[in-house]
Amino acid sequence: MPSNKKVSRSKLVKKLDTVFSQYIRLKNSVDEMATCFTCGKVDHWKKLQNGHFQSRKHYSTRWDEVNCQVQCAGCNVFKYGEQYKFSVNLDAKYGEGTAERLSIKAQQIIKLSNFEIEDMIKIYKNFVDSM
């Protein structure tokens, strides 16, 4: 018998974070190997992380595909995301001013409904399953 329990918002956000992280790492991998956006370390996509230029606390950029790039644990955790290198590499890859635009976008307040979060989970899960 299916449960009619409503899934909590925090569980939905966590699920979206997980599937979006997989998507970013798979999207940027070749033969299951990916390169750290800031230091260039190459490793299996499962051993790398989804690094954010603008903090995950900003919902407007938390699931932004430009704001999120593959990073090794050394850069993402121990070197606090290597923000300067991250910004330089963003501008090199996506065009001058990209890092500044993301900084501005991060300050915009957005409110996602649970339905919108569930929809994003489905979209990114489909991408991950097809990769």
Descriptions of predicted regions:
Residues 40, 44, 68-95:
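Short Cys/His-centered divalent metal-binding micro-motifs
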